[in-house]
């Protein structure tokens, strides 16, 4: 029985990458832009029901809720060839339609204002599921709606669905995209630490660099960058949609990658990479060894500078294509012999591999492709940059006027201080994880097992 997942797309960025994600899923499952299953896909062995449901007229509808405080991107989706794909009841745009003004606090307060309407949409989707496993949130942490409204939604998902998993695809910004983004990022990070079970970090800077360096795009468009993101998202869900012997549900996927509850931020790598509209002249033979070796190369990691220092806590390679399992074993041996991956001293130094089918409905230039999902202590470098930028602003109490105008900050700035502490603790946690004595850390502290900052939903597999 498929374990259903509901996708919540919040804000401009969240809806843009969500739109590309659904385009990709439709192509992979043989579903037309109107939601009709193509004749050539009638006998497919895939699990469409994880992310789609069938309406009474049998057309496929995404299990998705689309939220924004301004109408721009939602209207774009409603006017696109995919307009009839979505449930029209699951679009939400605020009545004022004036956005959050790149202000986390305004987005958060708007979330509280419209909580009842949003939860009603989500409840309706949940009631239509036979065995709901959890939620996926797509958003940016830099602006106002994705960060603020997204933060509020994360808290409410924990409150209303405490036993369901929450995974996010969170876009981390380019430098200085928005003046007040250090504030928005720190406030969002607190919720990603406390209220998500797993966060896939989508580093805009690194993804744009990959588009320039590897895809040879001189000036990558937002659509092209989002297409790369959708490729990663789709690949990370292939084991759920084309199930094999392992990692065929969300809890199994997360448990294999998150050894301790707080350290649940993942980086990604993908190879070989191309865009759907880009013809690639193939000059190499893709093998399992070639793909797995390339996934460990810095230039293929979609997180800036994160693996130059530190160690891997876990690696899961999702290999797609017609692959002989004996090739996997030989490839792992070769990689181990070359010692190309540095692991933490207190855990197993192993790369997990999940084999998955490729969609038979998409012509691929390569026989084998791979996605790496990795938990690496070096990811804290991204958090350190955000923390440093935030501290520079707070020293001068710069640009706080619009925050003080909102209910959450009108009396004091305690929420900033609380968020700062959570992020600092996260940075310290990842640094400590590089040391042999990490597993004994805090053993004398009776409250360690009841860390209030640990995600409430984390349930390790026995």
Curated annotation (Swiss-Prot):
Top-rank lineage group of the source organism: Eukaryota
UniProt KW Cytoplasm keyword: yes
Segments of this protein annotated with the region Disordered: 441-462
GO molecular function: GTP binding
PROSITE patterns, A to Z: TUBULIN
Gene3D superfamilies to which the protein is assigned, alphabetical: Helix hairpin bin (1.10.287.600), Tubulin/FtsZ, C-terminal domain (3.30.1330.20), Tubulin/FtsZ, GTPase domain (3.40.50.1440)
UniProt family annotation: Belongs to the tubulin family.
PANTHER family in the record: TUBULIN
Protein name: Tubulin gamma-2 chain
Lineage: Eukaryota, Sar, Alveolata, Ciliophora, Intramacronucleata
């Amino acid at each position: 029985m498929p374990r259903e997942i509901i996708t919540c797309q919040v804000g401009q960025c969240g809806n843009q990458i969500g739109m590309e994600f659904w385009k990709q899923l439709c192509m992979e499952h043989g579903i037309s832009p109107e939601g009709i299953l193509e004749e050539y896909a009638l006998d497919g062995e895939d699990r469409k029901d994880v992310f789609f449901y069938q309406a009474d007229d049998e057309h496929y509808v995404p299990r998705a809720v689309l939220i924004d405080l301004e109408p721009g991107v939602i209207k774009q989706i409603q006017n696109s060839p995919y307009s009839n794909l979505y449930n029209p009841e699951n679009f939400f745009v605020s009545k004022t339609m004036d956005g959050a003004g790149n202000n986390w606090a305004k987005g958060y307060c708007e979330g509280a204002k419209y909580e009842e309407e949003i939860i009603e949409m989500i409840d309706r989707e949940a009631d239509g599921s036979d065995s709901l496993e959890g939620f996926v949130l797509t958003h940016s942490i830099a602006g106002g709606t994705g960060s603020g409204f997204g933060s509020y939604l994360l808290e409410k998902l924990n409150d209303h669905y405490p036993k369901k998993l929450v995974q996010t695809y969170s876009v981390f910004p380019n430098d200085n995209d928005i003046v007040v983004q250090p504030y928005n990022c720190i406030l969002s990070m607190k919720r990603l630490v406390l209220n998500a079970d797993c966060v896939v970090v989508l580093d805009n800077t690194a993804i744009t660099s990959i588009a320039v360096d590897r895809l040879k795009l001189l000036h990558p468009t937002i659509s092209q960058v989002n297409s790369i993101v959708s490729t990663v998202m789709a690949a990370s869900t292939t084991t759920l949609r084309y199930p094999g012997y392992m990692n065929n549900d969300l809890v199994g996927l997360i448990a294999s990658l998150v050894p301790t509850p707080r350290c649940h931020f993942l980086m990604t790598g993908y190879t070989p990479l191309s865009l759907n509209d880009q013809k690639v002249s193939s000059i190499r033979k893709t093998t399992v060894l070639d793909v797995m070796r390339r996934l460990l190369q810095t230039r293929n990691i979609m997180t800036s500078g994160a693996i130059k220092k530190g160690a891997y806590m876990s690696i899961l390679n999702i290999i797609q294509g017609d692959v002989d399992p004996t090739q996997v074993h030989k490839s792992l041996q070769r990689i181990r012999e070359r010692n190309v991956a540095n692991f933490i001293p207190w855990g197993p130094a192993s790369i997990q591999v999940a084999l998955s089918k490729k969609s038979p409905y998409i012509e691929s230039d390569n026989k084998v492709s791979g996605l790496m999902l990795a938990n690496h202590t070096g990811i804290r470098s991204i958090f350190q940059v955000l923390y440093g930028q935030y501290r520079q602003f707070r020293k001068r109490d710069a640009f706080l006027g619009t925050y003080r105008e909102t209910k959450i900050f009108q009396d004091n700035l305690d929420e900033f201080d609380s968020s700062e502490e959570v992020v600092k603790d996260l940075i310290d946690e990842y640094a400590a994880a590089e040391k042999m004595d990490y597993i004994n850390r805090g053993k004398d502290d009776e409250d360690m097992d009841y860390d209030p900052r640990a995600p409430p939903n984390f349930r390790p597999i026995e």
